[in-house]
């Protein structure tokens, strides 16, 4: 599926993805994925519905949804390269992701963001969890991402 806004295009065609660029941005810049190895990036792409944002043939943004294609999705790894920010591309990317036929029918889509909640609220229809006390998460240390006490919510720091 493709969306066009000259000179930009958003595509779900995984063969167009510049996996090297995606890996470089996530590995070096994305606070949620710094240090993520190429092998993990490849595996996440293989197992997700991916959205590449391109200027001509050059990829300048990315997003993916981990989903069962029936009831649930997790939107993640959303970014626009710094040189293309301020042009409404993040807004457009979020709008396209939530409008995709395989996403818009899902009962629940989650995401996590420490700095773009307003964008996701306005352009994706997201809001804070209705019942945050019902949700749980599990942090797992991996070779590329060690859980630090600073990663945990304030109330959990004493339990580490």
Predicted regions and their residues:
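Short amphipathic alpha-helix that is part of the acyltransferase structural core
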Residues: 1-36, 147-160
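A conserved beta-strand-loop-helix scaffold within acyl/acetyltransferase catalytic domains
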Residues: 39-79
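Conserved acetyl-CoA pyrophosphate-binding loop and the N-cap/start of the following alpha-helix
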Residues: 84-93
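Conserved active-site alpha-helix within GNAT-family acetyltransferase domains
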Residues: 103-141
């Amino acid at each position: 599926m493709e969306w066009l806004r000259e000179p930009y295009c958003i595509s779900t065609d995984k063969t167009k993805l510049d996996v090297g660029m995606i890996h470089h941005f996530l590995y070096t810049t994305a606070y949620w994925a710094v240090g993520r190895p190429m092998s993990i990036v490849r595996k996440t792409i293989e197992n997700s519905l991916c959205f590449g944002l391109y200027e001509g043939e050059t990829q300048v943004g990315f997003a993916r949804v981990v989903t069962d294609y029936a009831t649930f999705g997790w939107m993640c790894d959303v970014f626009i390269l710094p040189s293309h920010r301020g042009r409404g591309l993040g807004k457009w990317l979020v709008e396209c992701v939530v409008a995709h036929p395989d996403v818009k029918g899902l009962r629940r889509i989650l995401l996590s963001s420490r700095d773009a909640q307003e964008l996701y609220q306005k352009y994706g229809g997201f809001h804070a969890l209705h019942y945050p006390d019902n949700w749980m998460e599990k942090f797992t240390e991996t070779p590329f991402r060690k859980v630090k006490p600073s990663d945990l919510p304030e109330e959990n720091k004493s339990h580490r």
